[in-house]
Amino acid sequence: LKDYVDDDGEGSEYGLYGIPDVPDDEKTPVTIVTGFLGAGKTTLVNYILKEQREMKIAVIENEFGAVSIDTDLVSENVQQNEDIITMENGCVCCTVRGDLLRTLIDFLDKRKTFDCILLETTGIADPSPIVETFNQDLDVKVNYRVDSVLCMVDAKNIVRQLNRKPTEARAVNEAAQQLAFADTVVINKTDLVTPEELTFVKDRIHSVNAFAKVMQTEKVRVVLGLCWD
């Protein structure tokens, strides 16, 4: 952040100690997508990439080999640079092999080439340390903002997942953690449950998180304006 500090080492008009006071609308928005394996996270990411053609989206995945982007989104002359793949519509996808913070820092030079970031987590990931990553480094903090934490749930299996006994190290299980941390919940595969079961699912979700916006869909086809600003 040396560009934000005066020559005499004093803080500039950007803020105390030279830390820039960057408005949120000038930071790259990040949507974190959580949810158990099979809930539809990757399908949602692919759907957004296909439907939001006017936006340049960077996708960060934990396991690119296991949860791949649809091949029809990748151009024939695909550009590859280590774990970064550039798609035909200008979007990019990269894999986190280790440190998410390092990946975000590496993206700083590229961030002005895309409009937003979709960060897809593994199925058992606790979202709280992922969100905290955006506060651990000053460069990351002034260049990115967590816009939304979106939790995908499988209508058929979420109640069973919520009923699982947590490990000794956790007060609640992974499904409850993901729901509790979300500001948007998408109930997927609603065609696989009865109306009564769906009502029960919604009640269970609200018992964990009464403040999240809850949407429902059959095959991840959602109104993008409601979950993707």
Language-model segment annotations:
Residues 2-6, 174-229:
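C-terminal accessory "lid"/substrate-recognition subdomains
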